Amino acid sequence: MRLNPDCIRDILLYVEENTGYMSYIPVPRNVHNFDIVLQNNYEPDEILYHIDLCEEYGYIHTDSGTIANFYIKRLSVLGHEFLENIRQENN
């Protein structure tokens, strides 16, 4: 699968908007039941692949959760810096 920088950006923006202290995003391991807003723009497999890359890059913190789900806990400092750099480039 190819790297899609737009997908990474959209995931990070979604995480920033939808997480908080003790407020996680459940992500089902069964991609066919994936109802995240991003699914309107990306295929479920592409979203999960890029969530994995976001974790690998150190942009997000996740928790393994259960057999059915894992959880996106929050953005990391690097994730916040990445979004801030994008916002500065767009101004």
Regions found by a protein language model. Name each.
Residues 2-37:
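Short amphipathic alpha-helical interface segments
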